[in-house]
Amino acid sequence: MANQELIDALRDAEAVKFGEFELSHGGTSEYYVDKYVFETDPGCLRQIADAFADRVGDAKLAGVALGAVPLVAATAVETDSPYVIVRKQKKEYGTGNQIEGDFDAGEEVVVLEDIATTGQSAIDAVEALREAGATVDRVIVVVDREEGARENLAEHDIELESLVTASDLLADR
């Protein structure tokens, strides 16, 4: 069931834009969900953190750098839980870490993400966490664009949950 308050907040913040847009995976779309709008709007961010907090349970939180860091940080404050940040690749300086923050081997981790299109960035984050010893079987996104992410994640034994779907967000438009 759609979170109508969140849908209204995303629309009111003008996080959904219409036109011709190139997406990160190379495809194009007639609409764009601008994560930077909803991640920098305190009202949207609060609603997202509340909704994530209702779903994460006792799992350690993880966010994919850079896009999901505000989301995981706000959720961590809401749940009073520590979190980790997963980089796209290992740093070439300092500690050289790909994962920042601590977790125990075998610990259950849930990945929070902004928008899922193909799901590849979430898959990459889950694989990095699994290689580091975490138990990860779930990704929660703000918006599922319904363009194959759910199926792609399922191929990696990862369940995709979304706060809203593109169908929800674009209904009545």
Swiss-Prot record:
InterPro entries assigned: OPRT, Or_phspho_trans_dom, PRibTrfase_dom, PRTase-like
Single GO molecular function: orotate phosphoribosyltransferase activity
Record keyword Thylakoid present: no
Cofactor or coenzyme needed: Mg(2+)
Binding positions (5-phospho-alpha-D-ribose 1-diphosphate): 87-88, 91, 113-121
UniProt keywords, alphabetically: Glycosyltransferase, Magnesium, Pyrimidine biosynthesis, Transferase
A Pfam cross-reference name: Pribosyltran
Superkingdom, natural source: Archaea
SUPFAM superfamilies attached to this UniProt entry: PRTase-like
Record pathway: Pyrimidine metabolism; UMP biosynthesis via de novo pathway; UMP from orotate: step 1/2
Annotated orotate binding sites: 117, 145
Biological role: Catalyzes the transfer of a ribosyl phosphate group from 5-phosphoribose 1-diphosphate to orotate, leading to the formation of orotidine monophosphate (OMP).
Family: Belongs to the purine/pyrimidine phosphoribosyltransferase family. PyrE subfamily.
HAMAP family for the chain: PyrE
PANTHER family linked to this entry: OROTATE PHOSPHORIBOSYLTRANSFERASE, URIDINE 5'-MONOPHOSPHATE SYNTHASE
Name recorded for this polypeptide: Orotate phosphoribosyltransferase
